[in-house]
Amino acid sequence: MKKILIPVSIIAVLLCTAAKDADQTVISPDRLFLADNGKSLFVTNRAGSELIKMSADGKEMEQKVEFSSPVNAMTQDPDGNLWVVCDGNYGMMYQLDGKKLSIQSKIKSGATPSDILYNPLSQSLWVAQRFNNELWEIDPATRKVKAKITVGREPVAMASFAGDSCLLIANNMPEMPSTAYPLAAQLDIVDVSSK
């Protein structure tokens, strides 16, 4: 898998130059996502609670989708659907048609879902629940929670590894009651087949 790292500041400059009028202004680009095997670039506008699809050359905004709150993460399933989780105490998970970017479904998804990924081995969506301190496995066909797994405090990011058989979860805070905590927190590993 090839990863492309683009500084958010470069995307911010591109977004400013791509905005042709006031309603295209992007105040706070926050996250970048690649879809369609790296052919589509998406950026979030945190202040506008928007997901923006950029042109292939990165010079124009092709389409915007507005959500109930800021987008925290996005993934794509093998059918081309985009799955988005949004911030907030009553966080939401959205399913979008990958071509039209129209919202197909919207469900409540815990307290501040912070990351989402599709795992081909389990054929499930996995959602890190930051303030529930849980990892949820969700069936994309039914959008029902299949499993809730307790992980460390404030899980904020995750990645598949070992042939997609495991998930590495990064937690924002260590397991200690003090607020004087080090910057480095803890990592959890979840075996997707045995949970």
Where do the language-model regions lie?
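Positively charged n-region of N-terminal signal peptides that target proteins for export
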Residues: M1-I4
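Bacterial N-terminal signal peptides
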Residues: P7-L14
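Predominantly soluble domains enriched in secretory-pathway, periplasmic, or organellar proteins
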Residues: L14-K195
